[in-house]
Swiss-Prot record:
Identification of the protein by name: Protein kinase 4
Higher taxonomy: Eukaryota, Amoebozoa, Evosea, Eumycetozoa, Dictyostelia
Keywords: ATP-binding, Kinase, Nucleotide-binding, Phosphoprotein, Serine/threonine-protein kinase, Transferase
Region (Disordered): 1-160, 233-296, 382-503, 520-556, 581-602
Protein family: Belongs to the protein kinase superfamily. AGC Ser/Thr protein kinase family.
Organism encoding this protein: Dictyostelium discoideum (Social amoeba)
One GO term describing the cellular component: cAMP-dependent protein kinase complex
Keyword flag rRNA-binding: no
Amino acid sequence: QQQQQQQQQQQQQQQQQHQKTSPSTSFVDYNNINNSNGNNINGTTSTCNSTSSSKSNSKEIYNENNNNNNNNNNNSFTNVHNNNNNNNNNRKRRNSHISYDTPDSNNIDNNIESNDTESGFRKNSKKSTDNNNNNNNNNNNNNNNNNNNNNNNNNNNSCNINGNINNGNSNNINNNNCSNIDSTLADVSKHQYTNQHQQQQNIQQQQQQQQQKNQQQQQQQQQQQQQNNQQQQQNNQQQQQNNQQQQQHQQQNSQQQQNNQHQQQLQQQQYQQKHYNNNNNNNNNNQPQTSNQNIQHSQGLNYNQNQNQNQNQEAPIVVNSLILRSIGMMTSKISKDFEELTTFMKSSCPMLLRFSGVENSYHILEKLNNIITQSLEGLPKTPQCSQPPFNQLIPLSNTTTLTPNNYNNNNNNSNNNNNSNNNNNNNSNNNNSNNNNSNNSNNNNNNSNNNNSNNNNSNNNNSNNNNNNSNNNNSNNNNSSNNNNNYSGFNDQQQQQQQQQQQQQQQQQQQQQQQQQQHQQQKHQQTQHSQQHQQQYQQHIQQNNQYQQNQNITQSSQIPQFKSNNIQSLIHNNQQHYTQNNLVNNNNNTNNNNNNNNYNNKTYYQPSVHENQYMASAIAPIHNHQSSPNPFYQQKLTIPQQTNNQSTRISAQFIIQNINNQQIQGTYINFNSCKLSDFKLFDLLGSGSFAKVRLCQHIPSERLFCMKILNQNKIIRLRQEVHVCNEKQVLMLTDNPFIVKLYSTFKDDRYLYFLQEFIPGGELFDYIRANGSLSLYVTQIYAAEIVLALEYLHNQDIIYRDLKPENLLIDQYGHIKLTDFGFAKRITENTKSMCGTPEYIAPEILSGHGHGKSADWWSLGILIYEMLVGVPPFVSEGSQNDIFRLIREARIQVPPEVDQVARDLIEKLVVTDVEKRLGSLEGGIEDIKNHPFFGAINWNSIQNRESAPLKPRIRPLKHHLMDERDEEDRISANFIKPDLLERRKNEFFSNF
């Protein structure tokens, strides 16, 4: 500190001397050189990180330098910076290039910055001189020219650390000052080093303290976690102990109940023995009747006893006889239903029958029905493998409790019956290994040897029973001694029971292990079966493909009725095998756990045995259907339910061959005499709000037709009776090559049937969506055909009102057919009914003031636009009201790529004013035909259907089974009263 004070005093003295000699060079202050890192030293621009005081000084100097860029003073500081154009960018570049950052340290006396070391400062000075030499051409020469001082001062610039420090006006600065500066800088560097070292030590100490704190916190957290884990373990142990205690209490309660039961049985049997021994006759020791009766007495069953005794006493009935009779009736009905179900499933889907368990449930119902009938008849029941023994069964017949009064009579028939009791009890125990308590309850008059005999097998029971007979044939006096022995042996019986329970538990564990092994074996077998079945399934597919190819090659003019159905049934049953085996492999665990005793020993799939059976059973219903056709709504049962789309399609070749077969198409059919039973239903072609369309075949001629099936209840609920009647009326009147033909109509209790022409090419809508749009040529041909169809209808005073791509079908030749005449109507003047599709409806229909034939020409313009563009012009993602608003405005925007002639026709058809719309003018329909859009059209060739614009795509049809008895039918019927429903049916649908 003393040295620092001395240095400060020396510096102050030097400053005072310098101020006296050269007051104009106040910027070149030795004190400021040591105090600030950001100041300019002797014209150099070396900058370092400084404190707030040094930064303020550097800013002042920097501002003064900016203000004095153009002054020609004697000051060397300004001359150095004014030799070049010193703009802000050069400064920033220079500062960033020269800056030398060092770690911060504490200030010494608030004046000396600790960032400037001797070596570092020299590096900065060298950089500054180099940069000054590069940027300023020969700075030293300029300094010498501008100053009036000695040349020795310039030489000091190259040797001194401070650079051009002697460029000022004073001549009193010598080499001693430079040495003093070096000494002061060396002292400063020492202090900087010591301060930095102290700071580093302080930082290290702080880091160590923080690490220690973190370690302590981690240790505390670990200890808390360990304590929490220990508490949780203790809680778990307590819960386990509580559970064990509860189990022990339950076991004790069960043992007490068993002991109470044994005591009651012993008391009852003791009373019986006393009463029997008083009136004992040794003539009835080995009679089977008495043995059977004593079994019934000992077990609480009174089968084949005196009816007077049962009638006089009102015994507590376990199950009432009325309930039993009602259950019997229900089981008999259910068993019949299950029998029908099993027979049908055997013929149609045998694998579903095998895996569903329906057959097993049928057997269970039969067992239940037999038990109920036997209990009602009062017959004794024999235990079966699926039933527990009698001592645990709750008897279903009228039973009475055992009291002493029940045995006051029939004394002569109850003498020494212990032998028969032992025989029957041993047999019952062999039937069910889980129930061994009955052995001890019935051995009351036996010795200790007889108690041990109950634990043996059935082979030892006969020998033990013979010994019992010999003991019982001695005299009546031995009975009293045997009774006393029974009391002493009761504790032994309890011990034996406990041992037996332990043995039972061990046996159960062994059984479970065996069952698990069986499950694993079954899984392995099932995987093998599934692999075999996949191979067989592929073979069947190959065979079916070969069969279809052979059929297509060798097929003559006639097609058999059953070939397609047989192929489909074979594929269908194979597909059932494949899918169901996969389901079994995925669900083995659940099925095996639920069906341990009944289903473990059964194999789920035997392809070699059942392969030909399910094929024949699937074909059989089709032959039966052909010989004796079912009601029309039940014909869906003859078509197997399909799961795979690829394997359940009616081939396109079958459709094409049927259509092109001249013999089939040329056969005469009297449609007036046809019935519903003459037609066989196939695939679902389409569906609507209250109608479904299915492919059908006329059985005698094998010709394909289209059957439109309409639900009467839905029609009435939607109030479409008039439209349905109009559709029939219009179709019966029309006969045009561009309109679908209606051959006949049928009716039953629920449905209306329209027999129509089958159009195999599909809808025009599918072609537009598949290609995006249609070409100009195709659009011209189809628009011309539609014009001819509408011309025919308008000449018949019929308006169509539902022109859209969905109602335009493509026949096998590639021409248009109009279908779905639900909104068609025969009119003589304008009508005001509101109907149509929102995107195609005319504005005059929306107004409700009346519309006529011109509404169809509006729809024609919309249709031509959609065929060329791909979408209708008036479309909105919102509600229908938005579409209606666009239609009323009729601001149609045709894309520029559309042909100009087509654009002109669309703009003339889509006009809100009916009087200005093309087709409604004086020329009528001729104005449309004469439009340049149809300039290249030969209307006679179009009428004769000579040229088709495209080839139709006849695709295979998927099987979609229609359930005629659907829920919507019942829901629609609930909205209408039955009387009103029948009255409206008779009013509108009587002519069908």
